[in-house]
Swiss-Prot record:
Residues 790-813 have a biased composition (Acidic residues). Residues 585-612, 1036-1063 form the PLD phosphodiesterase domain. Keywords: Calcium, Cytoplasm, Cytoplasmic vesicle, Hydrolase, Lipid degradation, Lipid metabolism, Metal-binding, Repeat. Its EC number is 3.1.4.4. Residues 17-33 have a biased composition (Basic and acidic residues). It comes from Dictyostelium discoideum (Social amoeba). It catalyses: a 1,2-diacyl-sn-glycero-3-phosphocholine + H2O = a 1,2-diacyl-sn-glycero-3-phosphate + choline + H(+). Inhibited by butan-1-ol. GO terms for molecular function: calcium ion binding; phospholipase D activity. Plays a role in cell growth. Hydrolyzes membrane phospholipids, such as PtdCho (phosphatidylcholine), producing the free headgroup and PtdOH (phosphatidic acid; signaling molecule on its own). Involved in the inhibition of actin-based motility and endocytosis. Its inhibition causes complete collapse of F-actin organization. Plays an important role in cell migration by localizing along the anterior cell membrane. Overexpression leads to the inability to aggregate even at higher cell density. Also known as a negative regulator of quorum sensing. This is Phospholipase D B. Residues 1-14 have a biased composition (Polar residues). GO terms for cellular component: cell cortex; cytoplasmic vesicle; filamentous actin; membrane; protein-containing complex; pseudopodium; vacuole; vesicle.
Length: 1216
C-alpha cells in the first residue's frame, strides 16, 4: 500500500464526521437486529470498512515503509503503548486488588477450570507470560495478515493502543486456526464459556459477528472486545441488549435477561469464585423490570419487556447492567487483565497546550479554543489561555476521569465547518474525551502526541477496584476511631486549627453554631464554635469550602440557606454551596466528611451540627444548658425545630429528657484521605457545573501539599505511658475521651461508671517493634494488600493453630479459667445469677498482671517499672487496653453510593457490594450497628438483599453446625415522632425485615429450622438510658445513628450508609464509607482457638461493647473472644434481657418497646422513689433487646394514614 492508498483510507475513515455527534437511530436488518457499526454507533444501512474487508476476506499486503510515514518502531510504540488501564468499566467486579489472587483467577479462566497449582506456581507462570509478552512486543514485525495499515485502522477505531493490538492478535492466533478468522466451532469451544447454553452462545456470537457469515474476523473480535472492556456506558448497554435479545426481535424479556444472568452466575462458580456480586439472578432482573423512582425522582412502571431505549434508560439505575452482569468481566480477565498488569506501576502525569473543539455551538459552527491541560490524580484540569493574563490557579473545567472514555480520532481534509481552523490541523490527529455530558475533541499536530495523551488519560481513568469502587485499596494508612461526638468534635477542632491551606466540609446538615469543645470552661467553649474556628483560619489565608445538602424535601428544614449566608458573611475565604437547587425531591446528600489540606480526612456518621455532641455517659438532662445549650438539647421523638435562634430551647428541660446520640466516626491520615478529597472535589465541581447560581464559586483541583499539619497539640504518648504505668492498670479505660460529666444529685454511679476514660497510649513504634519480635508470625510476612476483606485469606484456625500453640498456651489457660469463673445459669429474674452483675463475674486480672512482671528481657523508661515483653498475659492485656489509633498499619479503601444527580457520574454502589461481600464471607461473627435495618430476604421490596445475605450465612452455620454469631443493633424508633405516618412506616419496614410479615429473617429461619434455638445464632438489640433528676426518673432510647459493620474482628466498615435502599442502591442518597483492615495483628481466641485479628477492627468492637455493657477494664478480657457462650450468651444476651425486664417492670407501657399497638400514651418520666432507684440500679450499661413484638397488633402501613397525608401519595421507595 502506498501513501496515496493510505491517505484514501484515512479519508474514508472519517468522511462522515457527523457520526461523532449525531443522535443514534435504530435500523432493523432482515433478522430483526439493529446493525451497529464498529465505532459503537447505529448503522444507517452502509456497511463498515471492517465488514467490507471481512466479506472480501482480503487483507492488503504490507508495503515497504516510506520515510515520510511517522516512525512506528517498537521503541516508539512502547513509549506510548500499553499502560495500566483500569477504567471504571474494565475491571471485573469480582476481582480482588491482590495481584496474586488476581493472577490465580486469570489462570483459572484461561484453563477453563479451577487450577490445582499453588499460588506460587501460578505467580511464576504469570511472570513468565509477562516476559513472553514483552519479548513478543520487542521482536514483533508486521506480517502478511496483520499489516501496519490494519493496525492503524484498529488503533483509531478501538480503545486499544498498538502494543495492545499486537498482544491481542497473538492471543487470537492461539484460538483461531487460520490466524485472521475464527470459525463457529472455535468460538464455541475456545472463546466462550457458555457452550452449554445454546441461546446465550449464539446470541453472543451474533453480537460479535456483524456480517453474519458465521465466522469472526480479528477486526470483529477486537471491536467487540473494545466495547465490552473499554467502551462507553452507552456502547456497553447496547451490546448487553443485543446479547440478551436471543430471538432478535429488538425486545428483551424477563426470561431472556434471567437466562443470561443465571448462565453467567453458574459459570463464575466454575472458575473458582462463587462470590457473586450481582446477588440472586431474580434480584438483578427485578432491578431492571420493576417499578420505582429514577435518580431524578421520575417514576418507572413495571415492565415485562423492554425496548432498546427503555433498556438504556433503566440501565442508568443499575451499575451492573452495563457489565452484562459479569460477562464483560470474563472477557476482561481472559484477554485484557494480563496486559494491564504489564505496566501496573507506571504513573503518567502530563501538562501541555491543546486545541479544543466544542461542537454545535451558535450558527452550528465548531468553535476552537486553545487550552492548557494538566493531568494528575485522576483529574483532567483545563485552564483557559487568556491573552493578557494566565492564572493557572483558576481552571475553567475539572473532569473527574474515572468512568470516562477516551479515543484516538484521526482526520483528513476539513469539512466546510472546519475550514477556519489552522492549516496545520487540516490533517489532524487528536482524541475525544467523554464523561457524562462532557464530550470534547482535543487536536494535535501528530499521532504520537495524541497517543501519549490518550494513554495517560486511560491510566488516570482507572476505577472499578475491589467492590467496583472509585478508590484503590491502600496500605500503611493511619486510622483512628471515635465513639460518640465529643471525642470526634474535639479532634476535629484541633485538626482544623492546624490547617495550612484548605478545609473541606460536607454534610447532610452543617450548623455554624455547634460547639466542638465543651470541657474547658465557657470561654473556650465559645471559641470552639464552628463558625468562629473557620473564621479564624480564613483570616490566616486558609480556604474553606462547605458543601451542604439543600433540603429539597419539604418535610425537612435544616436552615441551609441561613447557614450559607452566615458562613460566607464571616469571611471572603469561606465558600458555601447548597446542592441540589430543585430536584430530586426524594433523595439527599448524606455524606459526612471533613478534609484538611487534602491529607487528613474524617469519615463516618456524625454531622457537624446541633444535637450530635455526645459523651459515653449518654446524659439525659442538662437543666442549666451548660453542656447542651439551646437547640443542642434535642429529642427526635418530639417536634424538632432545627432553624431559628440556636440559643433558644426547643423543649422544657424539666419535662422532656434529651435523646442521647450514639455514633462512630474515623480519622484517616495518608493516601486514602486524598481519595476522600477527590470525592469532595468531584461533588463540589459538579454542583458548580449544573447550577448557574454557583458559577462564581471557585473550581477545586487536587493538590499535593508537603508536610502534614502540625501535631504539636497532641499529648505525648510516652508521657501517658509513664503516667499510666505508675498509677497501675486498674484505672485505665478504653479510648481517648476525657472525663466530661459533672456529678449531680440523682446521677446513677453504677450506670455512669463506664465514663471514666483515660489515654493509655501504648502506641509507640519501639513497643510495637519489640512485641513483634517476640511473635512467631511477624506481620511483616503479610502481603500489604492481602486484607481479610479481599475474601481469599485462608482460615487461620487450621493453618496457624499449630504454629501459634506454644505462644498461646499460657494465655489460653488463663482465658479458659476466666470463662469458667463467669459462667452462671440464667433465670428470667434479674439478679446476681446472670449477666455482668454476677458476683463471680469480676476478676482481679490487672493486679495479677502487675505482680507477674519480670526483669528479664524488658525495656525500661526512666522512673517506670520494667515491662516483661515475654509475658503473654501482660502483652495481651495491654493490646486490648490500647488507644483507638492504628498508625501506618491499616489497609483502607473508600466505598460510596453516588450517581448522576449527586456527582455527575455513573451509578456506583460499592458500599452495598462491600456489605454483601463481607457478610457472605464471614467466618465467625457479624456485628452491625445502624440507624436503619430495612432490607429483603427475597421479596421485590426492599431491593437490597443484605438481610438475605445474613439469612444465608446463618443458614449455612446451622446446616454445618458451626458456632456463628450475628448481632444487629438498631434504635427502637429510627425516624422520630410517631405522630408522623412516615415514622411508623419505617418501623413497619424494620419489623418486616427482622421478625414480622412472613418474609423476615427470624420467621424464615424458624420455618426452616423449627428445632433450632435461634438465640444461639442471632441477637437484635437496642440501647436505652435512664437518669434520676430531682423528684423524677427519666428514660429515653439512645439514638443509634452509627453505621458500622465488623466481621470477625478483621475488617470494619464505618461511614454514612444506612442499611436501606436509599443508601445502598447508589442511585439515591449520596454516601461514603471506609473499609478498614489492619496489618497489625493481635493473637486472641475465637471460639476458644487461636485466631489472629486486626488491631483496628478488634479494638473498635471491644470499645463499643465496653460502652454498651458498662465494663470496667478488668472485665474486658471476658469479651475478647466474642463468640464463646460466656461472651455471647452469659454476658451479651443475658445483660440485654435483664435490662429489658427491669425497664418493662419499672416503666411498663410508657416506653415504646413495651407497646404492642399504636395509640398508647408515652411518658418521659415517672415519680422518683427509693425502691425504683434500687431496682434501676441493677441495670448494667445501656444494652437492651430489640422489641420483636413491638406494634405487632397494629398495621403500621395503613393505620392512622389518611388520604390527606403526604405518605398516601409518595412512592414507597421513599421509606425503604
Amino acid at each position: 500500500m502506498n501513501l496515496s492508498q493510505e491517505h484514501a483510507i484515512n479519508q474514508n475513515l472519517h468522511k462522515n464526521q457527523k457520526n461523532e455527534e449525531k443522535i443514534e437511530k435504530k435500523t432493523i436488518n432482515k433478522d430483526g437486529r439493529g446493525q451497529m457499526n464498529y465505532d459503537g454507533e447505529e448503522g444507517q444501512g452502509e456497511k463498515s470498512r471492517f465488514q467490507k474487508m471481512v466479506e472480501n476476506e482480503k487483507i492488503e499486503e504490507p508495503q515497504q515503509k516510506d520515510e515520510n510515514i511517522p516512525n512506528t518502531d517498537v521503541i516508539e510504540r512502547k513509549e506510548v503503548g500499553v499502560i495500566e488501564r483500569i477504567n471504571s468499566e474494565d475491571v471485573p467486579i469480582l476481582m480482588t486488588d491482590n495481584a496474586t489472587d488476581y493472577k490465580v483467577l486469570q489462570h483459572n479462566l484461561k484453563k477453563g477450570k479451577v487450577s490445582k497449582k499453588s499460588k506460587e506456581q501460578i505467580e511464576q507462570i504469570s511472570k513468565q507470560e509477562e516476559n513472553d509478552m514483552l519479548e513478543y512486543l520487542k521482536n514483533y514485525k508486521s506480517n502478511e495478515e496483520f499489516t501496519i495499515q490494519l493496525e492503524d485502522l484498529l488503533s483509531f477505531e478501538t480503545y486499544f493502543s498498538r502494543d495492545e493490538l499486537h498482544l491481542l492478535y497473538r492471543e487470537f492466533k492461539t484460538i483461531s486456526k487460520s490466524g485472521m478468522f475464527m470459525s463457529k466451532e472455535d468460538f464455541i469451544s475456545k472463546l466462550t464459556p457458555f457452550s452449554r447454553n445454546a441461546d446465550l452462545t449464539i446470541s453472543l456470537m451474533n453480537a460479535i459477528d456483524r456480517n453474519g457469515d458465521q465466522k469472526i474476523a480479528f477486526p470483529e473480535f477486537v471491536q467487540a472486545l473494545s466495547i465490552m472492556c473499554r467502551g462507553t456506558k452507552k456502547e456497553r448497554l447496547r451490546f448487553t441488549f443485543e446479547i440478551c435479545d436471543f430471538n432478535g426481535d429488538s425486545l428483551v424479556s424477563r426470561d431472556e435477561v434471567y437466562s443470561t444472568v443465571k448462565a453467567i452466575s453458574d459459570i463464575f462458580s466454575k472458575f473458582g469464585y462463587s462470590k457473586d456480586k450481582f446477588g440472586d439472578p431474580s434480584e438483578a432482573v427485578d432491578s431492571i423490570f420493576s417499578s420505582g423512582l429514577t435518580t431524578n425522582g421520575i417514576y418507572l412502571h413495571n415492565k415485562k419487556e423492554l425496548t432498546l431505549n427503555e433498556f438504556l434508560e433503566r440501565g442508568e439505575l443499575n451499575p451492573d447492567l452495563s457489565k452484562c452482569f459479569g460477562m464483560f468481566d470474563y472477557f476482561y480477565l481472559k484477554f485484557i487483565g494480563q496486559i494491564d498488569l504489564l505496566f501496573k506501576d507506571k504513573e503518567i502525569n502530563m501538562n501541555g497546550q491543546l486545541t479544543k473543539i466544542k461542537p454545535k455551538t451558535i450558527f452550528n459552527f465548531n468553535i476552537s479554543h486553545r487550552r492548557t491541560l494538566s493531568l494528575r490524580d485522576g483529574f483532567l484540569i483545563v485552564y483557559k489561555k487568556k491573552k493578557f493574563k494566565h492564572d493557572e490557579d483558576k481552571p475553567s473545567k475539572v473532569i473527574f476521569l474515572p468512568g470516562s472514555t477516551v479515543k484516538v480520532v484521526v482526520g483528513s481534509q476539513p469539512s466546510k465547518k472546519k475550514k477556519f481552523l489552522s492549516k496545520k490541523f487540516h490533517n489532524y490527529y487528536g482524541f475525544r474525551v467523554t464523561k457524562g455530558n462532557y464530550n470534547r475533541f482535543f487536536l494535535m499536530e501528530n499521532r504520537d502526541e495524541a497517543l501519549n495523551w490518550v494513554n495517560a488519560i486511560r491510566f488516570h481513568s482507572r476505577q472499578g477496584f475491589r467492590f467496583q469502587s472509585f478508590s484503590k485499596v491502600r496500605s500503611n494508612i493511619s486510622v483512628e476511631w471515635f465513639i460518640n461526638g465529643s471525642s470526634y468534635y474535639n479532634e476535629l477542632a484541633e485538626t482544623i486549627r492546624r490547617a495550612k491551606h484548605e478545609i473541606f466540609i460536607t454534610g447532610w446538615w452543617v450548623s455554624p453554631y455547634v460547639y466542638l469543645q465543651r470541657d474547658n470552661g465557657i470561654e473556650n467553649m465559645e471559641k470552639s464554635r464552628l463558625d468562629r474556628i473557620l473564621t479564624e483560619k480564613a483570616k490566616e489565608g486558609v480556604k474553606v469550602y462547605v458543601l451542604m445538602w439543600n433540603e429539597t424535601n419539604l418535610g425537612v428544614q435544616l436552615g441551609s440557606r441561613h447557614a450559607k449566608n452566615w458562613l460566607e458573611g464571616c469571611h471572603s475565604n469561606i465558600h458555601v454551596i447548597r446542592h441540589p437547587k430543585r430536584y430530586p425531591l426524594s433523595w439527599s446528600h448524606h455524606q459526612k466528611n471533613a478534609i484538611i489540606d487534602q491529607q487528613i480526612a474524617f469519615v463516618g456518621g456524625i454531622d457537624i451540627c446541633l444535637m450530635r455532641y455526645e459523651t459515653s455517659k449518654f446524659q439525659l438532662t442538662d437543666d442549666q444548658g451548660k453542656r447542651f445549650p439551646g437547640k443542642d438539647y434535642g429529642n427526635l421523638l418530639g417536634t424538632v425545630i432545627r432553624t431559628g435562634d440556636p440559643k433558644k430551647d426547643q423543649f422544657n428541660r424539666r419535662e422532656c429528657p434529651r435523646m442521647p446520640w450514639h455514633d462512630v466516626h474515623t480519622k484517616i491520615v495518608g493516601p486514602s484521605a486524598k481519595d476522600v478529597a477527590s470525592n469532595f472535589i468531584q461533588r463540589w465541581n459538579h454542583a458548580i457545573y449544573v447550577e448557574r447560581s454557583n458559577r462564581f464559586q471557585p473550581i477545586l483541583v487536587p493538590k499535593n501539599y508537603t508536610g502534614l499539619p502540625s501535631d504539636d497539640a497532641k499529648p505525648d504518648k510516652w508521657k501517658n505511658l509513664v503516667s499510666n504505668i505508675r498509677k497501675g492498670f486498674s484505672h485505665v479505660s478504653y479510648g481517648r475521651e476525657k472525663p466530661t460529666h459533672y456529678q449531680r444529685a440523682g446521677d446513677n454511679p453504677k450506670v455512669r461508671s463506664h465514663t471514666r476514660q483515660g489515654a493509655f497510649g501504648l502506641q509507640s513504634d519501639q513497643i510495637d517493634n519489640k512485641i513483634d519480635k517476640q511473635k512467631n508470625n511477624s506481620t511483616n510476612s503479610e502481603n500489604s494488600e492481602n486484607s481479610y476483606s479481599e475474601f481469599d485469606e485462608e482460615d487461620e484456625e487450621g493453618n496457624q493453630e499449630e504454629e501459634d500453640e506454644d505462644e498461646f498456651d499460657e494465655f489460653e489457660k488463663d482465658e479458659n479459667q476466666k470463662q469458667e469463673n463467669s459462667k452462671i445459669p440464667f433465670n428470667n429474674k434479674p439478679s446476681d445469677a446472670g449477666g455482668l452483675k454476677s458476683k463471680n463475674y469480676k476478676n482481679n486480672n490487672n493486679n495479677n498482671i502487675i505482680e507477674s512482671l519480670k526483669d528479664e528481657e524488658s525495656f525500661e523508661l526512666p522512673g517506670t517499672p520494667k515491662i516483661d515483653l515475654n509475658n503473654d498475659k501482660l502483652l495481651k492485656s495491654i493490646y486490648h487496653l490500647s488507644s483507638n489509633m492504628s498508625e501506618n498499619s491499616c489497609v483502607v479503601q473508600m466505598v460510596r453510593s453516588i450517581c448522576p444527580w449527586s456527582a455527575g457520574t455513573d451509578v456506583e454502589d460499592s458500599c452495598y457490594k462491600a456489605y454483601l461481600g463481607l457478610i457472605k464471607n464471614a467466618q465467625h461473627f457479624i456485628y452491625i450497628q445502624n440507624l436503619f435495618f430495612i432490607s429483603s430476604c427475597g421479596s421485590k421490596l426492599p431491593k437490597n438483599r443484605i438481610a438475605l445475605a445474613i439469612l444465608n450465612r446463618v443458614r449455612r452455620a446451622i446446616t454445618l453446625k458451626e458456632k456463628f454469631r450475628v448481632i444487629i443493633m438498631v434504635p427502637i424508633s429510627p425516624s422520630g415522632d410517631l405522630a408522623l405516618a412516615s415514622s411508623r412506616m419505617i418501623i413497619g419496614w424494620t419489623n418486616r425485615t427482622i421478625s414480622q410479615g412472613g418474609q423476615s429473617i427470624l420467621e424464615l429461619l424458624k420455618n426452616e429450622f423449627p428445632d433450632v434455638d435461634l438465640d444461639q445464632y442471632i441477637s437484635f438489640n437496642s440501647i436505652r438510658q435512664w437518669e434520676a433528676n430531682g423528684d423524677r426518673i427519666f428514660t429515653e432510647q439512645i439514638y443509634v445513628h452509627s453505621k458500622v459493620l465488623i466481621v470477625d474482628d478483621r475488617v470494619a466498615v464505618i461511614g454514612s450508609c444506612n442499611i436501606n435502599d436509599r443508601s445502598m442502591m447508589g442511585s439515591r442518597d449520596s454516601e461514603l464509607a471506609v473499609v478498614v483492615s489492619d496489618q497489625s495483628k493481635l493473637l486472641i481466641t475465637m471460639n476458644g482457638k487461636p485466631f489472629k485479628v486486626g488491631k483496628f477492627p478488634h479494638t473498635l468492637r471491644v470499645g463499643l461493647w465496653k460502652t454498651h455493657l458498662n465494663l470496667t477494664d478488668s472485665e474486658i478480657s471476658s469479651i475478647i473472644d466474642p463468640i464463646t457462650d460466656n461472651a455471647f450468651i452469659n454476658i451479651w444476651r443475658k445483660t440485654a434481657r435483664n435490662n429489658s425486664i427491669i425497664y418493662k417492670e419499672v416503666f411498663g407501657d410508657c416506653i415504646l418497646e413495651n407497646q404492642r399497638r399504636l395509640g398508647i400514651v408515652q411518658k418521659k418520666y415517672i415519680p422518683k422513689t427509693n425502691e425504683l432507684i434500687v431496682q434501676l440500679s441493677q441495670i448494667q450499661g445501656v444494652l437492651i433487646e430489640y422489641p420483636l413484638d413491638m406494634f405487632c397488633e397494629s398495621n403500621l402501613f395503613n393505620e392512622q394514614v389518611g388520604i390527606f397525608t403526604a405518605e398516601s401519595y409518595v412512592d414507597v421507595s421513599i421509606f425503604t
